């Protein structure tokens, strides 16, 4: 195994220097051009002190600068920290300080927005001249050095940083190439926001085999028409969806009959939510039977480097509701345990545990949480306790059976309900609160916040306050004021009762007293 991911890319540059590597709208970069630009940036960064385990932030829109910036950070020897320019300044500042990032690579228009609110040095990638030596730098990384740090939602009210090493990423990318080989004839669509780790394989898989990456225009990942147009005009062969977005995409194809426009598409990967049999059946009807496109279900937490299982979906009609998450990828082992940590046999539901080369180093500045989640299970086995319930079938495939805690996925985005609740509790006037998830349809999942207060609080005030700390995807769709929180016999908030209260008849801002509607005022969220 190579020591670092950038070395694999540099070896590919030697093989295919003049082949197109990156496509963004009407711009392209060849392998040689991308290598030279990222080398020029890397020299600048290394002269500034970037080296192994140095975390460098990158806050850009999807663009060619995004690719050059990430590759430049790695070539300098550092680890990249993706930051969303759409997140609140307070959240960004916490991540910057917590990670120890002293430098943020950005773009001019983003720099102007944040230069007064963020305490960090910022460098605009679109203002660099990219002159000087374009030759490769000496690789100064070991397999155990950090390659990236991605922050996920945290139950304590603050996001937590997951530290991934080069060896883990290389194992994941090399497995993907062995299992689903691609070549210079293939083009991967990069459409996942880079603050989520699915983007990592979209960012690097193509780069080690001579394929292309086509970068979808910012914000267009939610629009099927834009995905179809980009796929058609760039002969995209590989893409990823969250199941709920796949459902919306398939619905669009069914209504418009535009399946023939994406005949180049040969493989779709899904992850982030439970895949259902109806997704597979509709996919096969619209894409497999006509175009021969294949569907693969992936599963994995950020703490185990993107994905740890894969299940190739059948091309015939299936009737069972849930779809397996598959078998472990190479150099990964998985098993389920009971509440005492004892391994369970096949067919028994327990907590899913992961071991192997894909495990993260741990959480940034969270030694206690790292010790709780990353456990030395035996003398030679370190595991990550996922918090997911699962069982292993007799054929070796794993079935997902929900969560132990209050972590949820909404449109594929990982959310700790405790983080929302912690922020809501800090809002003046809120005495107690709880947030639940409601599945309204196959494509629509909503967050509903229940809060207890002496007086009613204006909806816009609640939303405005939460937006100071949380990204938009974590802002509840509905707020329900209750006179008194329902409690279980043990004194905990009874979320099952709240789930019954959070039905369609309650609008975006509703007041409940004793479980019945007291006052209701509807507003669009």
UniProtKB/Swiss-Prot annotation:
Catalysed reactions listed for this entry: holo-[peptidyl-carrier protein] + L-serine + ATP = L-seryl-[peptidyl-carrier protein] + AMP + diphosphate
Enzyme kind, highest EC tier: ligase
Phenotype of the disrupted gene, per the record: Disruption of the gene abolishes ZmA production.
GO molecular function ontology, one term from the record: ATP binding
InterPro entries named among the record's database cross-references: AA_adenyl_dom, AMP-bd_C, AMP-bd_C_sf, AMP-binding, AMP-binding_CS, AMP-dep_synth/lig_dom
Cited Pfam families: AMP-binding (PF00501), AMP-binding_C (PF13193)
Associated pathway: Antibiotic biosynthesis
UniProt cross-references to CDD domains, sorted A to Z: A_NRPS
Gene Ontology CC: one annotated term: cytosol
GO biological process: amino acid activation for nonribosomal peptide biosynthetic process; antibiotic biosynthetic process; secondary metabolite biosynthetic process
Enzyme Commission number: 6.2.1.72
Domain of life: Bacteria
Protein keywords: Antibiotic biosynthesis, ATP-binding, Ligase, Nucleotide-binding
Record-stated family: Belongs to the ATP-dependent AMP-binding enzyme family.
Its biological purpose: Involved in the biosynthesis of the linear aminopolyol antibiotic zwittermicin A (ZmA). Specifically adenylates L-serine and loads it onto the holo form of ZmaH via a thioester linkage to the phosphopanthetheine moiety.
PANTHER family named in the record: NONRIBOSOMAL PEPTIDE SYNTHETASE, PLIPASTATIN SYNTHASE SUBUNIT B
NCBIfam families in UniProt: AA-adenyl-dom
Protein's name in the database: Zwittermicin A synthase ZmaJ
Organism name: Bacillus cereus
Gene that encodes the chain: zmaJ
